[in-house]
Amino acid sequence: MKTGLVTSDTYQNHNTGEGHPEKIDRVTAVIDNFKKIDNKKLVWKKPAKFDQSLLINTHSSKYIDLVNKSFPENGLAFLDGDTVVSPGSKEATKDAVGSIITAIDGVQQKEFKNAFCAVRPPGHHAEKDKAMGFCIYNNVAVGANYLIEKYKYNKIAIIDFDVHHGNGTQDIFYNNEKVLYISTHQYPYYPGSGSDKETGKFNNILNIPLEAGTTAEQFLNAYENVLKKLKEFKPEFLLFSAGFDAHIDDPLAQLRLSSEDFYHLTKRTLEVSKSMCNGNVVSILEGGYDLRALQDSTKRHVDALIEFN
């Protein structure tokens, strides 16, 4: 089978303003690089429209109304100090969520074995009632809830290797025994959450805080704890919150991974998860702000997905 690549041109209309690190060029760089991959190995898909009621399982109706009213007719508006929306953000946010829904449906219907969603805005900082850190809707959380509600899964694992802790995803699933959330991240650092003492009501949260300057070897050694927890939980479906800002060249953090390290951690995770979830894996883009590093790292991440087929 092949790997799905789900993306939409609407990300280009999500304007965050001059000088903002979460810019249009991020996804353009990723997609341009994927176009060089042998097309026989990829299934390109556009996100399907989805029922907005799907958001209710993840975000409050009050927050959804707030977001819908926030998109300006022109110019820019702010949901928080660094989360910016423009007129085109409305469709971009819908397509970011729609991408993970489409990817999950494609895996479930055996259209492809696994999938990567190249989207913006990212999602893992968005809480149930709050936009934060460039994130509006929590894309991966909507995906996890969709798996539970539509496909009746009882064990979903989310692995978040973005350099920033996914406070939003943790907030949404802190008391949900059906979802295991694991995060490797620089700590202490933005957003301030993510200590190893935050474990969830059902021991369903695993935070692996890493000091600034953590090397690739140290990171990959720590990542063995991710795999150990995965084996204990035995997920039926695996989601990646795939941020690539732990790369040594990323301007927003101080971890020291290479693009090749993202290949190895992805491959290792897929090997471990095979016996549990039969390769049911969907990955969605989060952070990564050096364009060349982001290009190379997403390519190697998807290479691992393709090889697993």
What are these model-derived regions, one by one?
Residues 1-309:
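HDAC/HDAC-like amidohydrolase catalytic core signature
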